């Protein structure tokens, strides 16, 4: 059975504001989290169009993360290991898929929709009756849910952060019921790993990892609001291109990174359609 979790993450922003903040946060976060030989490599970033959702942006990334995996996963993975992320951004709706050429049974699908409310829509992404029966909902609080110690920075803690540009924050207990403006990211995550003996363990690991990333990323988007607020879409796309170039250079800055790039290309040529 595919594990289905719906994460609802409220932000003291409007949906239109978050369109800029999200792009800024992802670009900066990817650079900060990347190291020599490991991190998020942007392979493709181009406009796309869908008959239902209209014009959007397609992005493909290779996430090199061998040393960041738990030992029990490293034991079954090759030395050079990467996950393929494909994302179709038709804001305020996005679709993101994660696969791995080495582990064909692994698949993660994330459907996202953004609304100007505090997480009160009960079936925002139009799940079927069968999906609703197995769905669990997790309301993430960017101020009072804790991130791991290795990711915590006081200056990025919404309980202490005060925006000079927007005069928003610090966030107090119950802020999701009282603060305006407010918006919510609704994310439905389908995670499946159909390997007997490891399925439950891997699917739980994936969901925990996604929850941590969502919590950290949304905290940072708010904590960095004074840096991106007022940017146009053209401004943030230019920033995105700059940071993507810096991130790719950082990943491939050593011989190990170069080998990872070569091996990634070889794997991609051989295993991915």
Curated annotation (Swiss-Prot):
Residue ranges, annotated region (Disordered): 244-273
InterPro entries, A to Z: PI_transfer, PI_transfer_N, START-like_dom_sf
Family: Belongs to the PtdIns transfer protein family. PI transfer class IIB subfamily.
A GO-annotated cellular component: cytoplasm
Task of the protein: Phosphatidylinositol transfer proteins mediate the monomeric transport of lipids by shielding a lipid from the aqueous environment and binding the lipid in a hydrophobic cavity.
Protein name per its UniProtKB record: Cytoplasmic phosphatidylinositol transfer protein 1
Gene Ontology biological process: signal transduction
Gene Ontology molecular function: phosphatidylinositol binding; phosphatidylinositol transfer activity
Assigned keywords, A-Z: Lipid transport, Lipid-binding, Transport
Species of origin: Drosophila melanogaster
Pfam family, one: IP_trans
Gene3D superfamilies named in the record: 3.30.530.20
